[in-house]
Amino acid sequence: MAAEATAVAGSGAVGGCLAKDGLQQSKCPDTTPKRRRASSLSRDAERRAYQWCREYLGGAWRRVQPEELRVYPVSGGLSNLLFRCSLPDHLPSVGEEPREVLLRLYGAILQGVDSLVLESVMFAILAERSLGPQLYGVFPEGRLEQYIPSRPLKTQELREPVLSAAIATKMAQFHGMEMPFTKEPHWLFGTMERYLKQIQDLPPTGLPEMNLLEMYSLKDEMGNLRKLLESTPSPVVFCHNDIQEGNILLLSEPENADSLMLVDFEYSSYNYRGFDIGNHFCEWVYDYTHEEWPFYKARPTDYPTQEQQLHFIRHYLAEAKKGETLSQEEQRKLEEDLLVEVSRYALASHFFWGLWSILQASMSTIEFGYLDYAQSRFQFYFQQKGQLTSVHSSS
């Protein structure tokens, strides 16, 4: 989910109030003045950016004057702040140092120091395998990465058949990797349990949105979700866990026919396959590029249809099962089972990012309607859960 963002789950309109029992929006007083997202580097951060580039990149970066360093905000994350740092044109390169880099400054740290270390190791491994940007520097506040001429996909592009097929293939390749991390799938519920505990420990704020835990009985509901997923077979693979449009780059100068690159691996871990696919389908609904509060839109009707899901699943299986010969019956069974698996794990996506967003609201300095977003995700969770129950009851 970590991208840029606007409105709550509804018909696509921006703003409005949420009803507790559905995704419909009702008209409510415009008590929040319109404001646009601000994204700039403070004087102190500019000074530190200059120092980091000098120390970690060397070459011409050691000769650039502070006032010559070009620093531009990059549309990026709800977890991190991203900036493009460039050398001035008149300053020649000394060696092989890059002329521009991406500076990533960590936002509110929810994973802990150990997870940041693992992410840096993971980032370096993927770079060595040419599956991600190069890593130029790591420091407590963030890191310097290769700046890749590209643009992130747009939410509406996720539904384009050619791009959807390419994303499915890319995801299957990612799932096929062997990584030097624990293969036990503790990440999903381990992280959600930690988030829930942290939320319960938050001091009272008086904000009605912070009563989401009680409103939805989230502690009990997590137990219900766990039981459902324990009865849902899903292989454990190396998952990205956040394949949304902002984390999929369309390369401007691809070195081969593969024009897409996955980025932002901070949530990657061994996890259940169904979560990665279900999470991606949920992201068809959310557009994080809106420039006014609450900086996201939600269009529940954009959730992929069964036909669109099958299109994705067939291309995923074509890559994951490459070299295997399957009968038509075996292929059909795989597709049907995966549809059920993904629809159930999509619930976990809503639950995970809903908890994440409540926590972010309490600590993040990034402008985003985190509490609105949390409520949207939980409402969508209960709507989709109800649909699953209806299908099960009628079958």
From Swiss-Prot:
EC number(s) recorded for this UniProt protein: 2.7.1.32, 2.7.1.82
Consequence of changing residue 283 to K: In MDCMC; severely decreased choline kinase activity
Pathway membership, UniProt: Phospholipid metabolism; phosphatidylethanolamine biosynthesis; phosphatidylethanolamine from ethanolamine: step 1/3
Entry binding sites for phosphocholine: 77-79
UniProt binding sites for ATP: 75-81, 104, 146-152, 244, 264
Domain of life, source organism: Eukaryota
An individual GO BP term: muscle organ development
Catalysis: reaction(s): choline + ATP = phosphocholine + ADP + H(+); ethanolamine + ATP = phosphoethanolamine + ADP + H(+)
Entry keywords, A to Z: Acetylation, ATP-binding, Congenital muscular dystrophy, Disease variant, Kinase, Lipid biosynthesis, Lipid metabolism, Nucleotide-binding, Phospholipid biosynthesis, Phospholipid metabolism, Transferase
Modified residues (N-acetylalanine): 2
InterPro entries: Kinase-like_dom_sf
One term under GO cellular component: cytoplasm
Subunit structure: Homodimer, and heterodimer with CHKA.
Family: Belongs to the choline/ethanolamine kinase family.
Function: Has a key role in phospholipid metabolism, and catalyzes the first step of phosphatidylethanolamine and phosphatidylcholine biosynthesis.
Disease implicated: Muscular dystrophy, congenital, megaconial type: An autosomal recessive, congenital muscular dystrophy characterized by early-onset muscle wasting, intellectual disability, and dilated cardiomyopathy in half of affected individuals. Some patients may die from cardiomyopathy in the first or second decade of life. Muscle biopsy shows peculiar enlarged mitochondria that are prevalent toward the periphery of the fibers but are sparse in the center.
Miscellaneous note of the record: This protein is produced by a bicistronic gene which also produces the CPT1B protein from a non-overlapping reading frame.
Name of the protein described by the UniProt record: Choline/ethanolamine kinase
Species of provenance: Homo sapiens (Human)
Gene designation per UniProt: CHKB
